Amino acid sequence: MKTSELFDLSRTLAEPLLRVCEYPWEALDDIASFIRTVGPTLGSDFERRGEEIWVARDAIVAPTAFLGGPCIIDHGAEVRHGAYIREKAIVGKGAVVGNSTELKNVILFDRAQAPHYNYVGDSILGYHAHLGAGAITSNLKSDGSNIVVHADPPLATGRRKLGAILGDEAEIGCQCVLNPGTVIGRGARVYPLSSVRGVVPARHIYKSRDEIVPIR
């Protein structure tokens, strides 16, 4: 579940931020400052829209979408009708942010997709990772305590807010809840309507809490 195990860092504008992090959630506190540093250096193929918002000229942003800064929308990304980008978001090349999807303090790698009624908060979606319709990343425990990643051994994150970390090409079924601190490995899949906690290994299928099997 280390950064290098989950992601091809060449697939994100945030590579300089993530490459110094042993675990990906360590980057979350620095997303805003990273955007504020990188944004003004982006070339003429980006336009500045309001305070601390940079949008590639070939990105598609619906007039009904809300963009809150700081954020960067990279080349070829699509931000659809009714999308809500609250703040602190890096949306990668060719990524999709869909109808009624909300982003807050996130990195979406290139071609990542949150296309239908998703909440993605304090989370990272790897290259070509996909959230099915209605899937959400829950980022706060009901008691407000700090989040532990339930690995072997458990990893204390020191964070009160942490959603999910999805490795490259992870596939999440419709209406899933990824509980705080969930990590989905590269190429892993999660069945629809699942409530997931802990770590799903790379190239495994999560069918239920007691049935996580390799992809054949």
Outline where the language-model segments fall.
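Short, flexible, glycine/charge-rich loop motifs used to bind or transfer phosphoryl groups or to couple energy/partner
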Residues: 17, 49-50, 68, 96, ...
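Short secondary-structure boundary/capping elements
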Residues: 87, 95-98, 158, 162
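Glycine-rich hexapeptide-repeat left-handed beta-helix
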Residues: 15-16, 108, 115-216
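Residue "hotspots" at secondary-structure boundaries inside conserved domains
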Residues: 51-53, 71, 182, 198
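Terminal amphipathic alpha-helical/low-complexity segments used for targeting or macromolecular assembly
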Residues: 1-52, 57, 187, 193, ...
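Short, functional N-terminal and low-complexity linear motifs
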Residues: 1-3, 43-46, 61-62, 93-99, ...
